[in-house]
From Swiss-Prot:
Coiled coil: none
Known function: Required for maturation of 30S ribosomal subunits.
Annotated Gene3D superfamilies: Ribosome maturation factor RimP, C-terminal domain, RimP-like superfamily, N-terminal
Protein's UniProt name: Ribosome maturation factor RimP
Gene Ontology biological process terms in this record: ribosomal small subunit assembly; translation
UniProt KW ATP-binding keyword: no
Primary site of residence: cytoplasm
Subcellular location as annotated: Cytoplasm
Species, as recorded: Lachnospira eligens (strain ATCC 27750 / DSM 3376 / VPI C15-48 / C15-B4) (Eubacterium eligens)
GO cellular component: cytosol
Similarity-based family: Belongs to the RimP family.
Amino acid sequence: MGKRESYEAKTTELIQPVVEANGVELFDVDYVKEGSDWYLRVYIDKEGGVTIDDCQNVSRAFNEILDRENYIDDQYIFEVSSPGLTRPLKKEKDYEKSIGRMIEIKLFSPVDKSKEYSGVLKEYDKDTVTISIDDVTKTFDRSNLAMIRWAFVDEV
């Protein structure tokens, strides 16, 4: 396990009780380098969406743990936020919650001469994802998915 994965795993282990105590769920943890800066990002979610107060409460509580445990060698910036309107689908529960939603898919290899699709998620299993595009059903191999996330739909 590399440094990045190790820090993400340790953060996940340590923050789980904090998010539960604050009435939210852990969506994801990322430890990434952008430019010359390292970022430890914790994404939280709850039914109806998270508030700034939710993020602030988790951040304050976990900062104390980060200071005490001191398991990250690099200097880093710690952030807590929502996964956003165009959240990625990473875990099985993300797929389950997304049935009937508009999603965007980017593929590693083109299917029917395209690498990008948008449609309503109809079903999924461990190997495939099926979406409906203008009443046409299309199934993709999950191994070919470079990215799958909620599509931003402006309902004005």
